[in-house]
């Protein structure tokens, strides 16, 4: 319990601190505060012994909060704790990444239980078993389109014009069936909930799931069978979805395409696109559908925002 005096009439206001979301704040030495410790992104302040100060200057490090200390990071009175792990020099790019992960409470390692669950999974999709309960779309020309440096491919697309005399397209969007491998309340699920998403840095990726899943079973790599969930849609010439259904499927991506290779192919430079296994007919169909969807979006009055990434 902690509190502060409101005024003489109302006395003392008490609050209860149930738990801490972040138990080890990232800190640096702040000489302006008489060799005190200052938290990165919080008002955490503490004093260190002289030996610790000499060892930790110009370093990022964590502080383990004293469990008996019941004040929040925003309290006026300094928290108490001990030095945890040394992250690295404050002028290092790698240290900046590790500091950010620690400051936001994003784990960089998976629990032993999650790693064991991942290792127990098969190295490849057991197609003979999966095809009994999934729609077989392995002959459909689904492709992934991602950035140049992407390593995990979680969605694939394909479309073809309808021959019913009314125009429009059949569009398939397939996403990796993560729930087939990551069951609710399992160790993998618990670790994924801590991360919520994969975190991308300039020199490093912290995946939401172990590599066997993120770059393997749940990545729609070209030429291999993958379990997926599919949205199968009918889109009119006006870009309106007139029918759809969802179902589990077994797919086999035909190509790992990039935004650059696709755009170049649409503008006549097809070399890299073809090397990657792209199909010009399919990509032109997708582009025609895109333009219809874009026009429909404009008719709905959608707003565009320009921002720098």
Regions found by a protein language model. Give the residues of each.
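Conserved, carboxylate-rich catalytic/transport cores that coordinate ions
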Residues: 1-309
